[in-house]
């Protein structure tokens, strides 16, 4: 069975599913396929695990490559999950780039909501040299936070508080949820254990469907990545994040621009200078909106965009 899912825009009430074909009008650039890898030594494919091989941060002030040249990490593509879980060390660097802060009171990573207006991107590459690169805009990563009374919390300098849709994975699998997948046009070839990715065209209005030639045929209109860097999925566990609440007092801070990161100042361009340093804020009964994630089993094939 071959199929793809695309959630056209963040505010969309529905995505779309196409069985047995590719809609070449719904993406930009090249559609490039990579291998899907089995879990551990079982040789069974129980999740959509691919080789994630590079991450860069690009802003108006430059580009930083955040991974080594031989980097390869098993990553699950899962549309049943809202957020993206990155290896802890890489997540820390991303937070430095974006000026994000881990809030223990909320159990969330927080940023000023104005970050969604920033034109910078996080650029993910898969399958090694020649593999697909997906650019994720800040607007896809910033999620709302509201109080139990429906109010939007603010920092003391007046800026509203939002959640960043990226968290450290800890002992959980590295997982790319909706905050990544909204930016990707994805084709799932379950017959050949391949996944093809391209950049989503958010402005697409037409359709051009190309069918698979036959059962077991390669993904139409797609080229194959080198897949020189193979991976094995060994991590287990299910993220369960949702309905998070916090009581008591906390401190919200804007991180100063990180040293040694060229792109960081570009991501900081929308921040008020008054935001630097400690910004006291009472996190009384704050809840994270639009975040309810649970990693689902994938043995029978399913997908549902939130």
For the regions a language model picked out, list residue spans one by one.
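Active-site or ligand-binding cleft "flap/edge" segments
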Residues: 1-204, 208
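Aspartic protease catalytic domain
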Residues: 125-297, 301-306
């Amino acid at each position: 069975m071959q199929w793809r899912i695309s959630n056209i825009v963040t505010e969309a009430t529905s995505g779309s599913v196409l069985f047995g074909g590719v809609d070449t009008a719904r993406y930009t650039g090249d559609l490039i396929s990579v291998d899907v890898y089995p879990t551990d030594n079982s040789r069974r494919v129980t999740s959509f695990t691919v080789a994630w091989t590079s991450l860069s941060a690009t802003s108006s002030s430059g580009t930083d490559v955040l991974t080594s040249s031989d980097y390869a990490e098993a990553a699950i593509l899962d549309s049943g999950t809202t957020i993206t879980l990155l290896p802890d060390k890489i997540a820390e660097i991303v937070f430095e780039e974006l000026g994000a802060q881990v809030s223990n009171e909320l159990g969330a990573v927080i940023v000023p909501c104005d970050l969604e207006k920033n034109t910078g991107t996080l650029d993910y590459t898969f399958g090694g040299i020649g593999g697909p690169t997906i650019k994720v805009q800040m607007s896809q990563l910033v999620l709302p936070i509201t109080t139990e009374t429906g109010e939007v919390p603010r920092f003391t300098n007046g800026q509203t508080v939002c959640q960043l849709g990226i968290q450290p994975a800890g002992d959980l699998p590295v997982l790319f949820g909706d905050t990544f997948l909204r930016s990707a046009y994805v084709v799932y070839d379950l017959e050949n254990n391949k996944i093809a990715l391209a950049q989503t065209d958010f402005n697409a209005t037409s359709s051009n469907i190309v069918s698979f030639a036959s059962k077991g045929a390669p993904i139409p209109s797609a080229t194959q990545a080198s897949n020189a860097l193979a991976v094995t999925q060994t991590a287990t566990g299910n993220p369960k994040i949702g309905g998070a609440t916090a009581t008591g007092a906390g401190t919200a801070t804007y991180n100063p621009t990180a040293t040694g990161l060229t792109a960081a100042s570009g991501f900081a361009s929308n921040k008020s200078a008054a935001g630097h340093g400690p910004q006291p804020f009472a996190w009384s009964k704050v809840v994270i909106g639009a975040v309810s994630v649970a990693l689902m089993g994938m043995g029978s094939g399913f997908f549902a965009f939130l």
